[in-house]
């Protein structure tokens, strides 16, 4: 057996292992938050970036092994950015045989007209995109809108809101629009960005850079992202532990009277599920984050195709 053959076999093994991990994470997120139900038509928003390509690929993969039936339609918003390669996404989507729609709206021109040079464009751009995508979902009869935000995006949003907004708030894995007509889901909520990056490279997705956003190097989100990446390198497992904290919120140990009735706490009262004494005693914390090695070295070689948990 040649050295090249051995290398190819290892690459195939690593790709299968990575795909199974992503499938498992997406399947678990879908089940935990009841993201996709029987008969849903899921509109996958495809930007041409690594995240949305991975989202579409994994959902198509899961579609064949899920215990429920659902349909997928891919939608790309062509914002008329100069130099945008309009042929790339249609060619890719036709090659994999998925239903798709390209929506052409000159949001780039609106953003450039309204936002002064040097100012960040993300806020206006995202509002315009959201309105167009909601309208498109209605036109297509889509019951769910799937976005490609992942675990690291959710963590970055948490810190952005703490640092700059004074709120303990992140991206929800599932939300309903203000008018109650659209449900937005984020099936990559449990997926690490570094897994998605590796997967996109291995699958050779035809990535299209966003020149509008990429031209703004001092975005607050980019600064926070670099902070998280530094922590991940220096303290393995920290991001996993922080994400776990987002799923284990204790309102009685925060300071929001809207979430916990501090005013009516009385002597002799016993509160179910609340351990107030921890406020005085130092908690026993593990020397290393509990998720330090999760997923990186796990052996999935014997794992079957991931299936959604049964949803009532």
UniProtKB/Swiss-Prot annotation:
A motif (PP-loop motif) lies at residues 47-52. This is tRNA-cytidine(32) 2-sulfurtransferase. Signal peptide: none annotated. PANTHER family: AMINOTRAN_5 DOMAIN-CONTAINING PROTEIN, SULFURTRANSFERASE-RELATED. Catalyzes the ATP-dependent 2-thiolation of cytidine in position 32 of tRNA, to form 2-thiocytidine (s(2)C32). The sulfur atoms are provided by the cysteine/cysteine desulfurase (IscS) system. [4Fe-4S] cluster binds at residues 122, 125, 213. The gene is ttcA. The keyword Chaperone does not apply.
């Amino acid at each position: 057996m040649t050295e090249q053959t051995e290398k190819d076999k290892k690459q195939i093994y690593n790709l299968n292992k990575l795909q199974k991990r992503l499938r498992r994470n997406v399947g678990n997120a879908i089940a935990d938050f009841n993201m996709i139900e029987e008969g849903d038509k899921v509109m996958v928003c495809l930007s041409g970036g690594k995240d949305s390509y991975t989202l579409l690929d994994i959902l198509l993969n899961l579609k064949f092994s899920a215990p429920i039936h659902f349909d997928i339609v891919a939608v790309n918003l062509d914002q008329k950015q100069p130099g945008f390669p309009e042929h790339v996404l249609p060619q890719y989507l036709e090659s994999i045989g998925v239903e798709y729609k390209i929506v052409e709206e000159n949001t780039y021109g609106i953003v450039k007209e309204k936002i002064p040079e040097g100012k960040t464009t993300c806020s206006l751009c995202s509002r315009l995109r959201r309105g167009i995508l909601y309208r498109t979902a209605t036109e297509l009869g889509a019951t769910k809108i799937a976005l490609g935000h992942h675990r690291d995006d959710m963590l970055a949003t948490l810190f952005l809101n703490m640092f700059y907004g004074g709120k303990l708030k992140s991206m929800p894995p599932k939300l309903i629009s203000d008018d109650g007509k659209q449900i937005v889901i984020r099936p990559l909520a449990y997926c690490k960005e570094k897994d998605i990056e590796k997967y996109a490279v291995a699958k050779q997705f035809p990535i299209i850079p966003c020149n509008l956003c990429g031209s703004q190097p001092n975005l607050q989100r980019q600064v926070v992202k670099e902070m998280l990446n530094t922590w991940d390198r220096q303290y393995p497992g920290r991001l996993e532990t922080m994400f776990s904290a987002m799923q284990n919120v204790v309102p009685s140990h925060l300071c929001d009277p809207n979430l916990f009735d501090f005013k009516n706490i009385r002597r002799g009262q016993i509160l179910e599920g609340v351990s107030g004494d921890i406020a005085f005693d130092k908690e026993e914390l593990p020397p290393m984050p509990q998720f330090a090695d999760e997923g990186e070295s796990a052996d999935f070689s014997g794992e079957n195709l991931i299936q959604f948990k049964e949803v009532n």
